[in-house]
Amino acid sequence: MADGVDHIDIYADVGEEFNQEAEYGGHDQIDLYDDVISPSANNGDAPEDRDYMDTLPPTVGDDVGKGAAPNVVYTYTGKRIALYIGNLTRWTTDEDLTEAVHSLGVNDILEIKFFENRANGQSKGFALVGVGSEASSKKLMDLLPKRELHGQNPVVTPCNKQFLSQFEMQSRKTTQSGQMSGEGKAGPPGGSSRAAFPQGGRGRGRFPGAVPGGDRFPGPTGPGGPPPPFPAGQTPPRPPLGPPGPPGPPGPPPPGQVLPPPLAGPPNRGDRPPPPVLFPGQPFGQPPLGPLPPGPPPPVPGYGPPPGPPPPQQGPPPPPGPFPPRPPGPLGPPLTLAPPPHLPGPPPGAPPPAPHVNPAFFPPPTNSGMPTSDSRGPPPTDPYGRPPPYDRGDYGPPGREMDTARTPLSEAEFEEIMNRNRAISSSAISRAVSDASVGDYGSAIETLVTAISLIKQSKVSADDRCKVLISSLQDCLHGIESKSYGSGSRRRERSRERDHSRSREKSRRHKSRSRDRHDDYYRERSRERERHRDRDRDRDRERDREREYRHR
C-alpha cells in the first residue's frame, strides 16, 4: 500500500512537471535561468554575486523542469515567468520594486532577486522578478517602463542570457565611470549631487517577508552623511566632466536626526539612503512624471543639492543651494541659493547678502560640467551668509579668489593644456638631446629652461602630472649641464696634452738637431785634423827630398 502511495505521488509530480512544460510553451527562459544564468551569475561573468545568491532562501519552484522530484512541499507549483527589470538606481530596494509592481495591478510576484557586486555589496541596477502568469508579465513589460523609480524609468526584458550580458556590461561601464570620477572612496557628500552612482549602499533585494529587519544600506557614506532624496518634480543634475575634487559641504539629516559634525565617520547603516541620481541617457533636468515614491522622509525645507553642475571630489566646492519647500507634484518655482545647514545664513525669503566674490574672477560657464558656483553665471547670493569683504582695490597680495579663479577648469581645457605641456616637454627634450649630441650645449640648456618656464606658467602647473614633466625636464637639464662641464674639462685636457706633445716633439727635434750639429762638427774637425796631418806629411816628405838632393 505504501508503494502504491509512493507511485501515486511520483506520478503526480511528474504529471505536474509535464503540465508545466506544456504551459511554458515558448518560455524556456525559466530553465535557462535555473540551469545557466544562475551559475553564470555566481561563478562566471559576475563572481561577486556568489555570496549574496548563496544566502538567499530557496526560491519557489527552483526545481521545476530539472527532472528530479521535489522533496519539499511548495506552496506554489504552477506557472512561473521570469523577467529582468533594469535601469534601477543602486539604492532601489525590493520593497520599492514590489510596490511599483503592485501599483500596476500585478499581485502574483513569486520572487525578486537583485544582482549585486560581491566586492562592496552594491546593486548592479537590475533584478530578476518572477511572476505567476503570462498576463502579469505582459502588463509589467507594457506598463512598468512608464512608471518612475527614484527618478528613472525601469527597463523590463525577458529572462535570457543576452539581456543578462547587456545588463552586466551596463553595470560595469557605470562602475568604471564612477571610479574614473573619483567616487570610490565615500558616499555622496551632502549639499551636492554626485556625478555618477554614489558608492553608498542600497537595501539588498529580498523575498517579501523572507528576511526580517529594516532596509540595509551597506558601504560608507560621504563626510557628514548622505542628504535626503530630491523632492518630487525634480531630478538630480547631469554628471560633471571636470577633474576629481574634494566633496562639498555635508547635507542635512532627515527630521528627527541629529546633525553630525563635518567630516564625521559613516553614519548608521540603514537610517538614511543616498539621494537618487540621473541615470546615463536620461535628459538633463527632466522632471519625474509621477509622485514621490515611498521611502525616506522628504528633505528639510530650504536645503538640498545645488541646481548647477555638482562639484567633483577635488577643488573648491561650489555653494549648495536648496529647493524651495513644496508638496510632491510638478516642478515648482525657480531654484534659489541658500547656505548649507551647518553654517548661518538668511532664512528662506529674506533678502540675499551681497556677493562675496568679484564676478570678474569667475570664467564664463561652459557646457562641460564645470564645477563653478553656478552654470548660469556668478552666484547671486553669498552661500555662507558672510558680509561682503573689504575691498582691497589694486593694492596688496591677491586673496583666495585668485586661487579659485585658476582651479575651475573643465576636463576638455585641462586635457588640452596637459597635451600642450606634454608636447612642449617631449619636443624640448628631443631637441636638447640632438643639440647636445653635436656639442651645442648652450642651445640645449636654453631649450630646456624655456620649456620648464612655460610648463610652470600654465594653469595646471600644480597638477602631479605637470610636476612629473617638470622633474623630467630638470633631470635632462642637469644631465646636459654636467655633460657640458665634463666636455669642457676634457677639451682643456686635450689641449694640454696637445701642448705637451708639441713641446715634446719640439724638444726631440731640437735634441736631434743638436746631436746632428755636434756630429757634423766633430766630423769636420776630424777631417781638418786629417788634412793637417796630410799637409804635415807632405812637408816632411818635401824636406826629406831636399836633404837628399843636397847630399848628392
From Swiss-Prot:
<feature type="compositionally biased region" description="Basic and acidic residues">
    <location>
        <begin position="516"/>
        <end position="552"/>
    </location>
</feature>
<feature type="compositionally biased region" description="Polar residues">
    <location>
        <begin position="169"/>
        <end position="180"/>
    </location>
</feature>
<feature type="compositionally biased region" description="Basic and acidic residues">
    <location>
        <begin position="389"/>
        <end position="404"/>
    </location>
</feature>
<feature type="region of interest" description="Sufficient for nuclear targeting">
    <location>
        <begin position="511"/>
        <end position="552"/>
    </location>
</feature>
<feature type="region of interest" description="Necessary for interaction with SRSF3, SRSF7 and TRA2B/SFRS10">
    <location>
        <begin position="481"/>
        <end position="552"/>
    </location>
</feature>
<feature type="compositionally biased region" description="Basic residues">
    <location>
        <begin position="505"/>
        <end position="515"/>
    </location>
</feature>
<dbReference type="InterPro" id="IPR012677">
    <property type="entry name" value="Nucleotide-bd_a/b_plait_sf"/>
</dbReference>
<feature type="compositionally biased region" description="Pro residues">
    <location>
        <begin position="220"/>
        <end position="265"/>
    </location>
</feature>
<feature type="modified residue" description="Phosphoserine">
    <location>
        <position position="526"/>
    </location>
</feature>
<feature type="compositionally biased region" description="Low complexity">
    <location>
        <begin position="207"/>
        <end position="219"/>
    </location>
</feature>
<feature type="region of interest" description="Disordered">
    <location>
        <begin position="169"/>
        <end position="411"/>
    </location>
</feature>
<dbReference type="GO" id="GO:0005849">
    <property type="term" value="C:mRNA cleavage factor complex"/>
</dbReference>
<dbReference type="GO" id="GO:0005654">
    <property type="term" value="C:nucleoplasm"/>
</dbReference>
<dbReference type="GO" id="GO:0035061">
    <property type="term" value="C:interchromatin granule"/>
</dbReference>
<protein>
    <recommendedName>
        <fullName>Cleavage and polyadenylation specificity factor subunit 6</fullName>
    </recommendedName>
</protein>
<keyword id="KW-0488">Methylation</keyword>
<feature type="modified residue" description="Phosphoserine">
    <location>
        <position position="501"/>
    </location>
</feature>
<dbReference type="InterPro" id="IPR035979">
    <property type="entry name" value="RBD_domain_sf"/>
</dbReference>
<feature type="region of interest" description="Necessary for interaction with NUDT21/CPSF5">
    <location>
        <begin position="81"/>
        <end position="161"/>
    </location>
</feature>
<keyword id="KW-0507">mRNA processing</keyword>
<dbReference type="InterPro" id="IPR034772">
    <property type="entry name" value="CPSF6/7"/>
</dbReference>
<dbReference type="InterPro" id="IPR000504">
    <property type="entry name" value="RRM_dom"/>
</dbReference>
<feature type="modified residue" description="Phosphoserine">
    <location>
        <position position="512"/>
    </location>
</feature>
<feature type="region of interest" description="Sufficient for nuclear speckle localization">
    <location>
        <begin position="404"/>
        <end position="552"/>
    </location>
</feature>
<comment type="function">
    <text>Component of the cleavage factor Im (CFIm) complex that functions as an activator of the pre-mRNA 3'-end cleavage and polyadenylation processing required for the maturation of pre-mRNA into functional mRNAs. CFIm contributes to the recruitment of multiprotein complexes on specific sequences on the pre-mRNA 3'-end, so called cleavage and polyadenylation signals (pA signals). Most pre-mRNAs contain multiple pA signals, resulting in alternative cleavage and polyadenylation (APA) producing mRNAs with variable 3'-end formation.</text>
</comment>
<feature type="region of interest" description="Necessary for nuclear paraspeckles localization">
    <location>
        <begin position="81"/>
        <end position="161"/>
    </location>
</feature>
<dbReference type="Pfam" id="PF00076">
    <property type="entry name" value="RRM_1"/>
</dbReference>
<dbReference type="GO" id="GO:0043023">
    <property type="term" value="F:ribosomal large subunit binding"/>
</dbReference>
<feature type="modified residue" description="Phosphothreonine">
    <location>
        <position position="404"/>
    </location>
</feature>
<dbReference type="GO" id="GO:0003729">
    <property type="term" value="F:mRNA binding"/>
</dbReference>
<feature type="short sequence motif" description="GAR">
    <location>
        <begin position="202"/>
        <end position="206"/>
    </location>
</feature>
<dbReference type="GO" id="GO:0016607">
    <property type="term" value="C:nuclear speck"/>
</dbReference>
<dbReference type="GO" id="GO:1990448">
    <property type="term" value="F:exon-exon junction complex binding"/>
</dbReference>
<feature type="compositionally biased region" description="Pro residues">
    <location>
        <begin position="285"/>
        <end position="366"/>
    </location>
</feature>
<dbReference type="InterPro" id="IPR034769">
    <property type="entry name" value="CPSF6_RRM"/>
</dbReference>
<dbReference type="GO" id="GO:0042382">
    <property type="term" value="C:paraspeckles"/>
</dbReference>
<feature type="modified residue" description="Phosphoserine">
    <location>
        <position position="495"/>
    </location>
</feature>
<dbReference type="GO" id="GO:0051290">
    <property type="term" value="P:protein heterotetramerization"/>
</dbReference>
<dbReference type="GO" id="GO:0005634">
    <property type="term" value="C:nucleus"/>
</dbReference>
<feature type="compositionally biased region" description="Basic and acidic residues">
    <location>
        <begin position="494"/>
        <end position="504"/>
    </location>
</feature>
<feature type="modified residue" description="Phosphothreonine">
    <location>
        <position position="407"/>
    </location>
</feature>
<keyword id="KW-0539">Nucleus</keyword>
